[in-house]
Amino acid sequence: MNVEFNRNEDVMKLSLKQLQKHLHQISQGGGKKAIEKQHEKNKMTPRERISYLCDQDKPFIELGAFAGWEMYEEYGGCPAGGTVAGIGYVSGRQCVIVANDQTVKAGAWFPITGKKNLRMQEIAMENRLPIIYLVDSAGVFLPMQDQIFPDKEHFGRIFRNNARMSAMGITQIAAVLGACVAGGAYLPIMSDETLMVEGNGSIYLAGPYLVKAAIGEDIDNETLGGAVTHTEISGIADYKFNTEQECINQVKKIIGKLTHPLTAGFDRIASLTPSKEITELYGIIPSDSTKPYDMIDIIDRIVDRNDDGKSSLEQFKEDYGKTIVCGYARLDGWAVGIVANQRKIVKSKKGEMQMGGVIYNDSADKAARFIMNCNQKKIPLVFLQDVTGFMVGSRSEHAGIIKDGAKMVNAVANSVVPKITIVIGNSYGAGNYAMCGKAYDPRFIYAWPSAKIAVMGGDQAAKTLLQIQVSGMKAKGKRVTPEEEQTLLDNIKGRYEKQTSPYYAAAHLWVDAIIDPVSTRQVISEAIYAANQNPKIEEFKTGVIQV
């Protein structure tokens, strides 16, 4: 390995160390004292509950851990959006799990909490996975009620989804382990089965204080909406237990008795490890995002090897449209179609030198055709993003780059097979769209620590914004010195760089998680396993395409 490989490896490992540090910080929720208070009430933390619930010999993939990262700081922050969530196995069955974190503002819902819960319900609906709610929440965070309560994608959408999932036959189980108040009280009741822990679990539309204020009635928490009340008087809950462990054990039993569903039938054979060492991924990705590299080196370390020891990647139109690599492969045994941005400089058969990471007419045309082929064959698609955008200039415009780009976007948008997106490096502008960014409904979307997501590259954006700002100042008659201009540029670049980081994207749930590159195989395999649980694949139609 050369010096540059070692440098890249050092930078990536440093990034991963920082990632683990941040994840540990998030795992503390509302802090040590809040956790101790939870334990004093014989209550587990959300991560302890999930650990107790899930099969220990199978992976639990946490999603949305960075939701709310560096947001709501005026309110003390909202680690993980006040909700711990992900996909795990319960009694051998893959499930979506959502657990309120009572240590974070009593489990109150911030705007990002609603967005995260809706994302988890979306995953359950798209993949027909059972969903388990571990409820312990004080309801809407009142200081921000205007941003969480009334709109289409706000708090009320949760209960609409409860009803829709029930109609779709998706199992929903709610274990009420703490408070469940106001509008949130509808969630367990709209689930298939509701379990409560005596002494801690409570469900009511209005708590004792509000009841006193509204109608003058004095009543305690347990009598108003405790486990005994709802299992013996109202009939709202189905089971009551003395401890959380007993309650969660019953959840396991319920899930264990579910009928095994039909699947989509995506092809899978015995898995073989990659043909090249997967940990070498750390040294392949340049520490400088503008530098070229060969995307095949990434793919060969993610996909399975064949029996002959070589990579299972079979390139489609290998010598045409070289700035996008398309091909069929096996990944943990699954048959997949891969669409990946080639980052090295290539030469077309017409003699044109093409920049890596840029989508040209021929590569857009090739990718569109390949995506259509995968839909025809019902093969899941994996997008590996490191894209700076579409080629610009008169040569591309006259050749119809907009037409070819639109054809690729059309194919991605109308694709009916599951799409899984991994943001490896750059993800800029329309390139993000064409390579199945968040707006194009990937079943799952993950980012490496090296990812950058923005409308354009940092230097380009900063210089453009600087020109606008300086022009505005000059229009007002203000003279701008070179030193002032440089200070403005540095400030703009700093702000823009923060907004392009994977942490910013994960905080806003533009990606489901930031992952270690070595985990890429596992998360893609688990994503396809989840997608395979939905047997329904719609008919593939593209509508009007300009050719």
Can you say where each PLM-predicted feature lies in the sequence?
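Ligand-binding clefts of soluble mixed alpha/beta catalytic domains
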Residues: 1-547
